């Protein structure tokens, strides 16, 4: 009796549910933009104070429509937890330059930041 009731509910619910999700099946799947050999940053989910949010940079070894396998990390990583690592043009500094000024005291130095 219970199995027959379950069968009836299944037939009553399945068709409207399938019709409700049909529009999602008709949409084309848009894969992530990452390809083999790309360099990517991987999101660090648990960060401590002053720790960067992104672990950097890893090379993409394998891809699926939703995940990436990168060199140096054993687990697959969802594409939403990755961003492309851009490399600065050759000969340019990626950040600010620092200048060291020494003082009379050998244990003291002064660091000043210059323009990038």
UniProtKB/Swiss-Prot annotation:
It holds the Pfam family MLVIN_C. InterPro entries: MLVIN_C. GO terms for biological process: DNA integration; establishment of integrated proviral latency; symbiont entry into host cell; viral genome integration into host DNA. The keyword Transferase applies. GO terms for molecular function: endonuclease activity; nucleotidyltransferase activity. Coiled coil: none annotated. Keywords: DNA integration, Endonuclease, Hydrolase, Nuclease, Nucleotidyltransferase, Transferase, Viral genome integration, Virus entry into host cell. Its EC number is 2.7.7.-, 3.1.-.-. It comes from the Viruses. The Rauscher and Friend erythroleukemia viruses contain two components. The spleen focus-forming virus (SFFV) is replication defective, and causes foci of proliferating erythroid cells in spleens of infected mice. The second component is a replication competent murine leukemia virus (MuLV) that serves as a helper virus for SFFV. This is Pol polyprotein. It comes from Rauscher spleen focus-forming virus. The lineage of its organism: Viruses, Riboviria, Pararnavirae, Artverviricota, Revtraviricetes. The gene is pol.
């Amino acid at each position: 009796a219970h199995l027959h009731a379950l069968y009836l509910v299944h037939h009553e619910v399945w068709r409207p549910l399938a019709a409700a999700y049909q529009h999602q099946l008709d949409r084309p799947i848009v894969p992530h933009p990452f390809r083999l050999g790309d360099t990517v940053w991987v999101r660090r989910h648990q960060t401590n104070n002053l720790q960067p949010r992104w672990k950097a940079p890893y090379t993409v070894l394998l891809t699926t429509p939703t995940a990436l396998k990168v060199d140096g990390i054993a687990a697959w990583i969802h594409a939403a937890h990755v961003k492309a690592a851009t490399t600065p043009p050759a000969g340019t500094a990626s950040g600010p330059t620092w200048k060291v000024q020494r003082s009379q005291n050998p244990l003291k130095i002064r660091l000043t930041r210059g323009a990038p």
